[in-house]
Every structure is written in structure tokens, then in C-alpha cells.
Amino acid sequence: MRVTATFDKVADIIAETSEIDRETIKPESHTIDDLGIDSLDFLDIVFAIDKEFGIKIPLEQWTQEVNEGKVSTEEYFVLKNLCAKIDELRAAKAG
């Protein structure tokens, strides 16, 4: 399943970028609430994800949607949901 491969790569990136133990990173983990990733580390993680997958995560748009109450933080910041969004962006780019 592609989400698993995507999750494994994203979890590796998070572990490398934030020094969080790879074993503690789960698909259900919330990057902020559960893993304690701060905004600067998250920007580094997003940059690494963009580079790894050849996509551009619309972080400004996502943040705005969360701040305006259009979506919950879980929509974008729980890893299994983030990985699904990454796969959607990859599919859209592939056409």
C-alpha cells in the first residue's frame, strides 16, 4: 500500500529532522500534539518532504484553513492524513 511507503519515508524524515525516536512515530501521531514538533522543525520537515517527493505542500493554505476553522488540525497534522495528502499531491503532479 502506498500510504505505508509514504509513511515510512515521512517518519524517517521526521526522525532525522527533529531527533524524535523513529519507533515512537506512528500513523496516528499528531505532529504537534503527540510528537511535540515545533513550527520551525515542521517547516524543515515540510521542506524535506517537498524535496523527497518532488511536490510542494501548500502549508500556507493549510495553516490558513486551520486558523479559520475550516478544518481541524488532525486533517493535515496527523501523519496518516498528512501521508494521504502527500499521495494526493503526487498523483495530481503525475497527472
Swiss-Prot record:
GO CC annotations on file: cytosol; membrane
Pathway the protein takes part in: Glycolipid biosynthesis; KDO(2)-lipid A biosynthesis
Annotated compartments: Cytoplasm
The keyword Iron belongs to this UniProt entry's keyword annotation: no
GO molecular function, one term: acyl binding
PTM info: 4'-phosphopantetheine is transferred from CoA to a specific serine of apo-ACP by AcpS. This modification is essential for activity because fatty acids are bound in thioester linkage to the sulfhydryl of the prosthetic group.
Repeat in keyword set: no
O-(pantetheine 4'-phosphoryl)serine PTM sites in chain numbering: S39
Purpose: Carrier of the growing fatty acid chain in fatty acid biosynthesis. Is involved in the transfer of long hydroxylated fatty acids to lipid A.
Name of the molecule in the record: Acyl carrier protein AcpXL
Source species: Rhizobium meliloti (strain 1021) (Ensifer meliloti)
